[in-house]
């Protein structure tokens, strides 16, 4: 059973390497019509203005 899980994880990793951009979000991906950035946590000089995919926030500079 553990060997099957290891093989599945390895094949999934290989799949992600063959097709970049699938299943992951770039930190520099824009949101809110290009006015924000998708990040796991906003910087102190930014505020949360929405949600990106999964557990990412749409962060925008404070005015």
From Swiss-Prot:
The job of this chain, per UniProt, is described as: Has antibacterial activity.
The places in or outside the cell where this protein is found are: Secreted
**Tissue-wise, where is it found?**
Expressed in testis, epididymis (caput, corpus and cauda), kidney and neonatal and adult brain.
**Gene Ontology CC terms:** extracellular region
Keywords of the record, alphabetical order, are: Antibiotic, Antimicrobial, Defensin, Disulfide bond, Secreted, Signal
Which Pfam families would you find in this protein's record? Answer: Defensin_beta_2
Q: Organism classification, top ranks?
A: Eukaryota, Metazoa, Chordata, Craniata, Vertebrata
Q: List the disulfide bonds.
A: 31-58, 38-52, 42-59
What is the recorded name of this protein?
A: Beta-defensin 35
Q: Mind telling me which InterPro entries this protein's record contains?
A: Beta_defensin_dom
Q: Does the keyword Disulfide bond apply?
A: yes
Q: Which GO terms describe its biological process?
A: defense response to bacterium; innate immune response
| Highest taxon above the source species | Eukaryota
Gene name of the encoded protein:
Defb35
Task: Give the similarity note.
Answer: Belongs to the beta-defensin family.
UniProt KW Oxidoreductase keyword: no
Q: Where is the signal peptide?
A: 1-23
